[in-house]
């Protein structure tokens, strides 16, 4: 039985972010739809060929998406909210963009659908909306068209589909409440139709993703898998695909299904290969996810060989990435600025394909010399001076409970803060960043490339900060920000100023739609060699009598949005970052900054997928935040910001952060998130986001007032702040001014109505 290689998916955006540029050009009306579609075809063809040349035997098709793969599945099933539909009932790429962005080059603007994190990753998806009695039909044939493309190019392929049960699990009911699982019988005919079309094309295997099977699902949802897969069986071979955790707790459900193979994540799961081999039906193929799809580290292939070799020849076996390589940068070979030592520790998506090929060849032949050669740099890294810092390790070991306690409780601090700031009712602020204009990005790029000296760069940044302060004062905001003109990314910026991180030139990964991020890589112990944000915060405060917030990214978010080390725990990394940023809080306070925001948008996304593992994570995650913040005096107001969160199941931990003010993303969920704070009787101040910054649509004064009145039904008005959902870096100035003017006007109206 020859072992084959495959990947669960590949990065879509292109090495130079070609997809992002094509999307944004199309949205701006600068290119045609045909030109956009052509870029997609070119990228798919290139990526299939690259994977093939790197040694992948079965290429994934259907992993490409114009926004995200869950939204693609919604269109496949004809699940289009009424507000986004074309007048003639047809579905096209602009339909997709209206759902994701709220607008497109054609059709009427409408509120974008809700967006949230994909399991515990930094990738996002558009949440499917379900209504009672909803009808489904095959309306979007992107998958079939891409299968035809790949077959025409002569590739051996494996189409990829998001499974029906996971799709329903990921959605939300809109309108009259009902059990969305009852829609399963209605979407299965569409899946049957698609599988029949794939069978007609001679497809042997289909990868059907059911990552919900790694969760602690309610019994009714577990019970739904058997009838669903009974309905889908028989047309093609199905590779039931799971990732991000192990499957052992749900293995009884899985082995009862009429599928022909199972993919398991052997990186993030704790499944035992021998037990899986023993319990799976003897005729099933096992796809072993041995190469980490979510990081940038070179794999120890000798270890992977030992992990799987015992079952070679005993059942059909494929070797694969643990999950889609979507979460990894594309190609390490184009990184020219990493020094040789550090570069030897890494592997990006194409190199991971090469790792799979090396592993396949060794498992098929029994020859392991190539694996030992590949793995040698990993042994060297374990002893590198660039990894270990004795002073950091000593400080971490000396942390006490007192280091995570503010001097006094919130009630005492709030009095001191009210006396200091004298803010009006319904105080207005923004979350931190202002539009990153072409001029700002050009300024940073010229400085980075050496085309601009430090003095001219600093003069330019200072002018943009000054303009941001002027804009905010003109708008009438109460608490200002400096706008973050000097920051390329909220995590990358801090990583650049902390020891223990390295950066790539082209290590882009998709976050959502056209948004890409270039995560820093934690290669060693973390420390702060010098103040990071103090100079610009102090300058901004000197321009105004209103308070200006100091802006920090929190330790858990820096951890979650970086590629972490694998040789220490996530807790260790988070607390090292917290200690470094604790010094930053102290320095900001000493410089006269009275309000300091520590953003933790990733706190919830870092949760383990199984609820039984949550407590330990939340304990150290909360402690890291408190270590970061607790150095502040009573009269210093600590804010935190979170987005895409459902809080009801972690409210104890949110309260335990003990932030004086929390701002949250609520507009897309119509203030639903505040129910959690109301039920918990959250004691501190809250800024529910009153408009969606991910959409270019400008909210009306009436819309914002209505949301704030709804918020005041749940939270006492004296504890409410008024702010957008998130930072404004991706927006343009015209819509930013208009939206903030309406937001300030709404707050003024509510003050006058008291």
From Swiss-Prot:
Annotated residues for binding of 5-methyltetrahydropteroyltri-L-glutamate: 17-20, 117, 515-516, 561, 605
Sequence positions that bind L-methionine: 431-433, 484, 599
InterPro entries the record matches: Cbl-indep_Met_Synth_N, Cobalamin-indep_Met_synthase, Met_Synth_C/arc, UROD/MetE-like_sf
Binding site for Zn(2+): 641, 643, 665, 726
Catalytic activity: 5-methyltetrahydropteroyltri-L-glutamate + L-homocysteine = tetrahydropteroyltri-L-glutamate + L-methionine
Co-factor note (free text): Binds 1 zinc ion per subunit.
GO biological-process terms attached to the record: methionine biosynthetic process; methylation
EC number(s) reported in the record: 2.1.1.14
Biological pathway: Amino-acid biosynthesis; L-methionine biosynthesis via de novo pathway; L-methionine from L-homocysteine (MetE route): step 1/1
Annotated keywords: Amino-acid biosynthesis, Metal-binding, Methionine biosynthesis, Methyltransferase, Repeat, Transferase, Zinc
Reported cofactor(s): Zn(2+)
Residues involved in L-homocysteine binding: 431-433, 484, 599
Broadest EC class assigned to this enzyme: transferase
Residue positions of the active site: 694 (proton donor)
Molecular functions per Gene Ontology: 5-methyltetrahydropteroyltriglutamate-homocysteine S-methyltransferase activity; zinc ion binding
Family of this protein: Belongs to the vitamin-B12 independent methionine synthase family.
Function: Catalyzes the transfer of a methyl group from 5-methyltetrahydrofolate to homocysteine resulting in methionine formation.
Protein known as: 5-methyltetrahydropteroyltriglutamate--homocysteine methyltransferase
Gene name for this UniProt entry: metE
């Amino acid at each position: 039985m020859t072992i084959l290689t495959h990947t669960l998916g590949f990065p879509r955006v292109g090495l130079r972010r070609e997809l992002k540029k094509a999307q944004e050009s199309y949205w701006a009306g600068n290119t045609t739809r045909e030109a956009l579609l052509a870029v997609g075809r070119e990228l798919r063809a290139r990526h299939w060929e690259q994977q093939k040349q790197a040694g992948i035997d079965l290429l994934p098709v259907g992993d490409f998406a114009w926004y995200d793969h869950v939204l693609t599945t919604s269109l496949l099933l004809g699940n289009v909210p009424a507000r986004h539909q074309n007048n003639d009932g047809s579905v096209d790429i602009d339909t997709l963009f209206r759902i994701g962005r709220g607008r497109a080059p054609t059709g009427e603007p409408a509120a974008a659908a809700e967006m949230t994190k994909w399991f515990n990753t930094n990738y996002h998806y558009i949440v499917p909306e379900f209504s009672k009695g909803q009808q489904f039909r095959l309306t979007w044939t992107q998958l079939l068209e891409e299968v035809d493309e790949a077959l025409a190019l002569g590739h051996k392929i494996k189409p990829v589909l998001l499974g029906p049960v996971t799709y329903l699990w990921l959605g939300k009911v809109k309108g009259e409440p009902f059990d969305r699982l009852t829609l399963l019988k209605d979407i299965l005919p569409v899946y049957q139709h698609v599988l029949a079309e794939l069978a007609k094309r001679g497809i042997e295997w289909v990868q059907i993703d059911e990552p919900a099977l790694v969760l602690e699902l309610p019994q009714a949802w577990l019970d739904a898998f058997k009838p669903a897969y009974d309905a889908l069986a028989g047309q093609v071979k199905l590779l039931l695909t799971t990732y991000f955790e192990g499957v052992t707790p749900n293995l009884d459900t899985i082995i009862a299904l009429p599928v022909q193979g199972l993919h398991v994540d052997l990186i993030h799961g704790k499944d035992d290969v021998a037990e899986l081999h023993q319990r799976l039906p003897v005729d099933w193929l096992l796809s072993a996810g041995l190469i980490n799809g979510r990081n940038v580290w070179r794999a120890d292939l000798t270890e992977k060989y030992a992990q799987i070799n015992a079952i070679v020849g005993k059942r059909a076996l494929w070797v694969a990435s643990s999950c889609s390589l979507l979460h990894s940068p594309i190609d390490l070979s184009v990184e020219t600025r990493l020094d040789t030592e550090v570069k030897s520790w890494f592997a990006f998506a194409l190199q991971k394909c090469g790792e799979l090929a090396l592993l396949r060849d060794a498992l098929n032949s029994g020859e392991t010399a190539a694996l030992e050669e590949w793995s040698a740099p990993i042994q060297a890294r374990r002893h590198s001076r660039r990894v270990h810092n004795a002073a950091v390790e000593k400080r971490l070991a000396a942390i006490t409970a007192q280091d995570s306690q503010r001097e006094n409780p919130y009630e005492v601090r709030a009095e001191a803060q009210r006396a200091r700031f004298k803010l009006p009712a319904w105080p207005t602020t923004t979350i931190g960043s202002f539009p990153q204009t072409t001029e700002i990005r050009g300024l940073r790029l010229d400085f980075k490339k050496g085309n601009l000296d430090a003095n001219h760069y600093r003069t330019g940044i200072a002018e943009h900060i000054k303009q941001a302060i002027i804009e905010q004062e003109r708008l009438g905001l109460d608490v200002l920000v400096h706008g973050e003109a000097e920051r390329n990314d909220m995590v990358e910026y801090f990583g650049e100023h902390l020891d223990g991180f390295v950066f790539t030139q082209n290590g882009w990964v998709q976050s959502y739609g056209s948004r890409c991020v270039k995560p820093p890589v934690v290669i060693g112990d973390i420390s702060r060699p010098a103040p990071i944000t103090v100079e610009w915060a102090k300058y901004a405060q000197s321009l105004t009598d209103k308070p200006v917030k100091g802006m920090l990214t929190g330790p858990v978010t820096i951890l979650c949005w970086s590629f972490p080390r694998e040789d220490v725990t996530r807790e260790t990394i988070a607390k090292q970052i917290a200690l470094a940023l604790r010094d930053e809080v102290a320095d900001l306070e000493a410089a006269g900054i009275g309000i300091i925001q520590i953003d933790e948008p990733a706190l919830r996304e870092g949760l383990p997928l199984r609820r039984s593992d949550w407590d330990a994570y939340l304990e150290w995650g909360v402690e890291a935040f408190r270590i970061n913040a607790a150095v502040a005096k009573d009269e210093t107001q600590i804010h935190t910001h979170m987005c895409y969160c459902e809080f009801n199941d972690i409210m104890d931990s949110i309260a335990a952060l003990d932030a004086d003010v929390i701002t949250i993303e609520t507009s897309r969920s119509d203030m639903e998130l505040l129910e959690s704070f109301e039920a918990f009787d959250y004691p501190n101040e809250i800024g529910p986001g009153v408009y969606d910054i991910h959409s270019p649509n400008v909210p009306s004064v009436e819309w914002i007032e209505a949301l704030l009145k709804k918020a005041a039904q749940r939270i006492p008005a004296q504890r409410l702040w008024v702010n957008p959902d998130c930072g404004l870096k991706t927006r343009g100035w015209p819509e930013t001014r208009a939206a903030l003017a309406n937001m300030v006007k709404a707050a003024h109206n509510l003050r006058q109505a008291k």
